[in-house]
Amino acid sequence: MMKGMKRITVNWHLEKDCNYKCKFCYAHFSHINTNLNIDQGFSLIDEIKKNDIYKINFAGGEPLLNKNVGEFIKYSKQQGLKTSIITNGSRMTKKWLTKYGRNLDQIGISCDSLDNITNTKIGRGFGNHVEITERLLSRINLMNENDGLNIQTKLNTVVLRNNHMEDWNDFIIRNNVRRWKVFKILKIVGENDHVYDGLSINDKQFYNFIDRHRLLNDKGILVKEDNEDMSNSYIMITPDGKFYQNSNNQYIYSESILDVGFKNAIKQTGFDYETYEKRGGDYSL
């Protein structure tokens, strides 16, 4: 299945817990009781590497709540994988970056509004998330310049009713963000369908937001994803080591990858490379 494919990313949601309460979240994993332990995690990374994967992205929940995330990143890099992490930034300290930053190719930060009141209303932090985001971006840029790190910065933003009128142009340029993923809020049954109607926007509102940032789009910084782009176009792994896939606005799950192997497990959930490529997933670090 992977033959001829290039630069495939696997998103391992290794930690189910989170210290934020984003209302639109579609990765609660409320039915999962445990994460993989460190030995199981190393075995999972071995399986990923054996199947011609280009990059592993560590996500959550909040991945920095997982005590083993740094060692998993380090091990992945040792196996020759490109590495990235998506975090809310609240727990990524200079000490952590000093220890593990050389093993990271990309750090993505989730931030949905440039207004702290709006962030708080939607559950993104506790009133200072804009400052947390900008401080971390600045820290990464400085450590790249002064400490020999080579980490690309990325921002993830979910566009919904509360923020679709905002203008991010200055913020993105000022903070040297290399890649900005802009998602239209996605409805997932059993995850956020109970709040979706109060947060959703229509296509016109979403594409007005994209058009407002056309300069960033022209520069290749902005990468938009509407709901169609997010269907069957990600390779995602649960905290307990199963593939899962967004299909028709609900998740389907495979058997354990460690039990049946990567190739057998991914056949159970599917993956559409053409949609992955269309949404800009195939890119180099």
Predicted regions and their residues:
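Active-site loop signature of alpha/beta-hydrolase-fold enzymes
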Residues: 20, 66, 114-116, 188
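Short low-complexity, flexible loop/linker segments enriched in glycine and/or proline
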Residues: 72-73, 98-105, 123-124, 196-197
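Residues at the C-terminal ends
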Residues: 50, 78, 101-102, 148, ...
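Conserved alpha-helical substructure of the radical SAM core
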Residues: 2-84, 91-98
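A cross-domain feature marking catalytic cores of carbohydrate-active enzymes
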Residues: 14, 60-61, 85-89, 111-113, ...
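Structural recognition of alpha->loop->beta junctions
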Residues: 95-114, 171-182
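Radical SAM enzyme [4Fe-4S]-AdoMet core and its adjacent flexible, acidic
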Residues: 116-285
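Structural preference for beta-strand elements that scaffold enzyme active sites
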Residues: 9-11, 55-57, 82-84, 106-108, ...
